Amino acid sequence: MKNNIIKKIEDIIGKKNVLLSSEDKNKYLTEWRNRYPGKARAVLRPKSTKEVSLLLKLFHQKNIPVTPQGGNTGLVGGQITYSSKDFIISLERMNKLINFNKVDETIIVQAGMLLTQIHNICDENDMLFPLSLASEGSCTIGGNLATNAGGVGVLYYGNTRDLTLGLEVVLSDGSIINLLKTLKKDNTGYSLKDLFVGSEGTLGIITAASLKIFQKPKDKLTFLASASSPKKALDFLRMLQKNTSIPLTSFEIMNNHSVDIVLRNFGETKLPISKKSNWYILFEFSSYEKNKNTTESISEIVNLGIEKKFI
């Protein structure tokens, strides 16, 4: 006879969305390096905020542990359970666009939408959602919110928290808090959304978010340089920031180990620098107008960094 709790869960989300076999659960219980092999009684795949609410209400009543999961791209094991009594709630089916407003420069999506899907929606409408990171093809916006992801554009656009206008959250007892505001100039009451962003599911499960989007730049200049040390890289960053009014929208320092992993796993990728280094810098300027003088101006500043031996 089927366990009573499993039967109740199936009544909420449907039998096919309750994964019980080891084969079905496996991809949710391991990350790509196989460093955090987990255990779970079942993986649950709700499709709506209401279903998440009913699940958490049930687990709250039964005092059953649960872990929310986005794209399972985290590298510290926070998205995986380690007890065969616990449950994982995967939000992968909650991947719908709720609203897109080009005039207000906002987008509202369910938490299971892939980051790259948000990029595509914005790109099709000549807009930009600036959060960008290596796992964007498989990570979800819910995971980005739960971890307050930074990405390569963090110095200019800020962390995920800075890009968030509002949230919809389900608390541990099943209560739904709708904070899906799109008003940018909002000084009413406590900023509860800021508590949930970065809380990694400990305060509740984020089910939807309203986000800031931006006009898409007309031109981009992307550079890869080598540096002898992180200090030299930071000296170069300060020099760039002081000597140009053109937005420096990305600046990422990478060690040679990280670059070697990319080169080993992506065979067509080539390092466009002849001499290997211990440190590399990936940086990008964005402009809202195409201008030959812009390219020349930035090139002069980069060459100045070479002369000063920052890069």
Residue ranges and their predicted role:
Residues 1-311:
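Noncatalytic alpha-helical scaffold of FAD-dependent oxidoreductases
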